[in-house]
Amino acid sequence: MAYSTFSIPKQVIHGNNALEFLSTLEGKRASIVTGGHSMKRFGFLDEAKTQLEKAGMEVQIIDGVEPDPSITTCKAGGAKMAEFQPDWIIALGGGSPMDAAKVMWVYYEHPGYDFMELVRFNFPPLRTKAKLICIPSTSGTASEITAFSVITDTDNHIKYPLVSPQIVPDVAILDDRIPAKMPPLITAQTGMDVMTHAIEAYVSTAADDYTDPLALHAIQLVFEYLETAVNKCDADAFIRA
């Protein structure tokens, strides 16, 4: 008899100031993976670093992850981690830094691993050196709770969807303050991304009694709140989050 699996992080930390959870972690070193400048501009990168330092950790920053992260970026990030030897990998930002951090993690724990094996969904075992925390800055990708990563082969202009329960984050931190900084256009775009994911989940051949209620509720929330979130973003920051 065929069976299904439903993989999500062991912990989902949510609410205002949820970044404070980072101060409770145990370990010696943490690598923060982030994208452009928004997380630094709004102070969340420095706040995450401060919370990790409160936990007694040395912190490495791996920034500049581009939209649609490349194989090259992931390998370079994995090499930097190999030099630093983090106990925790913290992805902070949108889908791109979260997707990149997942594959950097592979190259950190398994240097030289064949990328095409990942494309074939043959992932090596992880968590022998580090665990992964994802902290999203938008509401659209859901990479913080999924087994997916999308990485681009820039030489051949191919985007590869990678899937494995190995890369489901150990912890997702949903701090309301972070996505509340999204401008209206990004709020609209990522809100429709949520709708697309939810509809796909509901009509998927892999849908089941565990996933259907989540998909339907997500669709309902988008219909109820997305217009308000876009048009009244200053007054309804919580809704946008």
Region locations from a protein language model:
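Short acidic, glycine/proline-enriched helix-loop-strand junctions
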Residues: 9, 55, 104-113
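Glycine/serine-rich anion-binding loops at beta->alpha junctions
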Residues: 86-102, 137-143
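ATP/NTP phosphate-donor binding region
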Residues: 1-88
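Active-site segments that bind and position negatively charged phosphate/pyrophosphate groups
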Residues: 201-241
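Short Gly/Thr/Asp-enriched flexible loops that form oxyanion-binding sites at enzyme active sites
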Residues: 76-78, 97-110, 145-146
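A glycine/threonine-rich phosphate-anchoring loop and its flanking beta-alpha core
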Residues: 109-209, 213
